[in-house]
């Protein structure tokens, strides 16, 4: 597959923001095959109008050398080519391949049970706390719903029109969020690594299996981690208000 595209200046799944570039839902994926035929659906502006099957990817990305890359897969090789860098990345059994890049990124990282957990940010006074929230969410969901299926998980601060967005092994977090909403969004988007990414669902026709289960999972997390200051009643009230 060969194609050329011009990115819009927009804070969305795919677009150029002031400090980062989002490449989400831009890469060709396998069309879902359901009930003996390929599944076709209209793109909706609300929700997550995608139905994605699993595949394995090897991606080569060439960017100006000043840019740091966060992606669905692990970087398996990195080469400097004069003023550019070439990254080779791979990911197995994922439903999509997404990338965020910026020349402003700093990276906080840790390791948990063989999983590399990374937090990419450019405007954050408490990056260690947000990295810890991602790790605690992974730990809780793994113990509650089953082991996290990948060996890397990245949370990325970026320009985005909503609170956040989920991709396999990669969560986008809006740079416009306050502290409380940032923590909530990290926990919420991390739950999507089970509900959509690991389990899979028809996000168009059965959206409750995506956002519904994710919101429920986040409520369970905060119920078991009261130090974050969220209650189930508060989360239900906020959801109903939307």
Indicate where each model-derived feature is located.
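Extended, low-hydrophobicity, Ser/Thr/Pro/Gly-biased non-transmembrane segments
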Residues: 2-104
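Catalytic cores of transferase enzymes with a strong primary signal for eukaryotic protein kinases
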Residues: 3-5, 16, 110, 177, ...
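Acidic/His/Gly-enriched intrinsically disordered linker/tail segments
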Residues: 205-207, 211-242
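Short coil/turn segments at secondary-structure boundaries
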Residues: 13-16, 71-76, 104, 113, ...
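Secretory-pathway/luminal and periplasmic proteins that interact with or process carbohydrate-rich
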Residues: 8-11, 97, 163-167, 221-229, ...
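A generic secondary-structure signal for well-formed alpha-helical elements
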Residues: 3-9, 65-67, 145-149, 194-198, ...
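Juxtacatalytic substrate-recognition/specificity segment
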Residues: 59, 88, 106-206
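Alpha-helical scaffold segments in carbohydrate-active enzymes
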Residues: 92-95, 140, 213-220
